From Swiss-Prot:
GO terms for cellular component: cytoplasmic exosome (RNase complex); nuclear exosome (RNase complex); nucleolus. It comes from Dictyostelium discoideum (Social amoeba). Disulfide bonds: none annotated. It comes from the Eukaryota. GO terms for biological process: exonucleolytic trimming to generate mature 3'-end of 5.8S rRNA from tricistronic rRNA transcript (SSU-rRNA, 5.8S rRNA, LSU-rRNA); nuclear mRNA surveillance; nuclear polyadenylation-dependent rRNA catabolic process; rRNA catabolic process; TRAMP-dependent tRNA surveillance pathway; U1 snRNA 3'-end processing; U4 snRNA 3'-end processing; U5 snRNA 3'-end processing. Component of the RNA exosome complex. This is Putative exosome complex exonuclease RRP42. Its main location: nucleus. It is found in: Nucleus, Nucleolus; Cytoplasm; Nucleus. Non-catalytic component of the RNA exosome complex which has 3'->5' exoribonuclease activity and participates in a multitude of cellular RNA processing and degradation events.
Amino acid sequence: MQKISPSESLFIQQGVENNIRSDGRNRVDYRNFAIETGEIIHANGSARVKLSQTEVLVGVKAEITHIQSEITSNLQQSDTSKRLVFSVNCCPSASPEFEGKGSEFLNIELSKQLERLYSHPNVIKNLKLTNPIISNNNNNNNKIKEAEEGKEKEKEGDIITNSGDDNCFSIVSGKYYWTLYVDAIVLDSDGNLFDALSIACRSALQNTRIPRVKAIQGEYEEITFEVSDDPEDTLSLSIDNVPICVTLTKIGNQFVIDTTLQEELCMNARLTVGVNSLANICSIQKGGIDGLDPTTINQMINTAKVVGVKILNIMDKTLKEISN
């Protein structure tokens, strides 16, 4: 475990108390971050985020999952909230703490934090597959093409696809769904790791493209799938209400955002708040050994709302520029 000397710790605490941190920022200043998408060619979506020296790479892979018919509607609805499967792996080269078995606990903790962030009902409800925007000429051609394909498929069986319907990620309602495996790799760490992870995951989901699938029911009720090989014939994800995390760390009597690795070594307590673009709170998790009084918690949450919306606006602007 990394350590910091008493003199270094005192220097950082006094700087935070005087609103002048060791890197020149004030208590609520966020470091600049960079986003790159489409980094992993064979993934359905990917993104790389660099927050100072903290660097995270996320890839998204889509697979068809069969839901057993005997599952009740309540269990099925609950299972729908698990259409996203998260896995985090911290590279040993990113930090001495990640060497050997040092990263095992952190990998599990970060993965579960992402699961909690995305388990909010409003996140799953609004994270839908949407149709791509097609020009009028192409749309007419596609309608002709689909009509011709439909006549051919009538001879083989009934087309029962409902991709992109109101049931999140559904291919055949109640039977087959898309499951998205979101795998993250921590390439380097200089503090505020989970915030960087949440930014990278949201960016990767925005970059995700899922091929259109037709589910065809045969004569004996068996279902086969026809996956479009047209790279333009895809579905994308609506991420408008997908949150990111803002972590607020208490050092001494004050709290700061976007901590460096050295600042984290001086931490008394922290609060990680999931915020979406509407400034709604999607998750809250406390860490650290010290307690937090209600007044401080309210101040932290209000700060997280303001900072979170600001970061999301920057993200959406950056992702729009990348897409264009």
